[in-house]
Every structure is written in structure tokens, then in C-alpha cells.
């Protein structure tokens, strides 16, 4: 009979943790990748974490609203995408603020500043500013796509 090696094992040998150690989830590459995300990167203040997360979200939220939104077949599709993305960022900021207020009521600061009400408030503020900025950058690029395309093609030397 062939001997089989278990690829999926309990995390740190403890089956009661509720996490499985797989070649993907427990690899050095995955740990490095997740460790470099703004939520886990060391040395970032909560407002900078929120700013970075917000910029990414604001930038990529324009696309679905532009291509799939109610104004997709009109000349106002880009402004419709901008308004939809800004509204969604506003709702997400309200949800982040509510989460921070409810979760960290009356708790004093711990080692991680993101685990306090004040830190979470800073994260939400950074998310709002970054999200709005990212959405406006994406709108500017979409609205001036012919100019940006010309720059990359070398027409403006």
C-alpha cells in the first residue's frame, strides 16, 4: 500500500484552533504578502492605513458603476460612475465609523492603535479622504482617456 503524506494539517499541530495549515495559507510567500498589506504593515498610523485602503477602493469602484450603472449608454457614464462610487464610499465610511464606535466602547488603548475607538475613527477618516481622492483620480483618467492614451503611445513628444 502506498504511503500518503497529509498536505493539509492542523495549524501549529493544534486541531482546536479552527485553522488549517495548507501549502498555500502557511507558505512564506503568503505570510509576506499578507504582512505587507496596509492593515498589517508595521509602523503605519491608522490614518495612513485608511488612506491607502481608501485610495485603492475609490479607484476600483468607478469601473463597475461606469460600465454597469444606469448611465452606461449615455455621455454621462463617467460622472454617473463617479457619483455612484462617491456615494458607496460615503456609506462605507459611515459603516466603518459605526463599527469603531460600537466595537471599542469604553475600552482603553492596547498595543495596536487600530484596536481603539480613536484609532478606528482615524482609519475611517483616512478611508474617506483616500476613497474620494482615488475616485476623482479614476474619473479624471477616464474622462481624459484619449490624452492619457496619446501620452503612452508617444504622440506628445
UniProtKB/Swiss-Prot annotation:
Q: InterPro entries, from UniProt?
A: PSI_PsaL, PSI_PsaL_sf, PSI_suXI
The record gives the membrane topology as: Multi-pass membrane protein
Q: Which UniProt keywords apply?
A: Membrane, Photosynthesis, Photosystem I, Thylakoid, Transmembrane, Transmembrane helix
Give the top-rank taxon of the lineage listed in the UniProt record for this protein: Bacteria
Q: Which HAMAP family match?
A: PSI_PsaL
Assign the protein's first listed, main location to one coarse class.
membrane
Annotated Gene Ontology cellular component terms? photosystem I; photosystem I reaction center; plasma membrane; plasma membrane-derived thylakoid membrane
Q: Which compartments does it reside in?
A: Cellular thylakoid membrane
Can you cite a GO biological process for this protein? Answer: photosynthesis
Q: Name one Pfam family in it.
A: PsaL
Residue ranges spanning the membrane: these are: 82-102, 127-147
> What family does the entry list?
Belongs to the PsaL family.
| Organism listed in the record | Synechocystis sp. (strain ATCC 27184 / PCC 6803 / Kazusa)
Name-wise, this protein is: Photosystem I reaction center subunit XI
Amino acid at each position: 500500500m502506498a504511503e500518503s503524506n497529509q498536505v493539509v494539517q492542523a495549524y501549529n499541530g493544534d486541531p482546536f484552533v479552527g485553522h488549517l495549515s495548507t501549502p498555500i495559507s502557511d507558505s512564506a510567500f503568503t505570510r509576506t504578502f499578507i504582512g505587507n498589506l496596509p492593515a498589517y504593515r508595521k509602523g503605519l498610523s491608522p490614518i495612513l492605513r485608511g488612506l491607502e485602503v481608501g485610495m485603492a477602493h475609490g479607484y476600483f469602484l468607478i469601473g463597475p458603476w461606469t460600465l454597469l450603472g444606469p448611465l452606461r449608454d449615455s455621455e454621462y457614464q463617467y460622472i454617473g460612475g463617479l457619483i455612484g462610487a462617491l456615494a458607496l464610499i460615503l456609506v462605507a465610511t459611515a459603516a466603518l465609523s459605526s463599527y469603531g464606535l460600537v466595537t471599542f466602547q469604553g475600552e482603553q488603548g492596547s498595543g495596536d492603535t487600530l484596536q481603539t475607538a480613536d484609532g478606528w475613527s482615524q482609519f475611517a477618516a483616512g478611508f474617506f479622504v483616500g476613497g474620494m481622492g482615488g475616485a476623482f483620480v479614476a474619473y479624471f483618467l477616464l474622462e481624459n482617456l484619449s490624452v492619457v492614451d496619446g501620452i503612452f503611445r508617444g504622440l506628445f513628444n
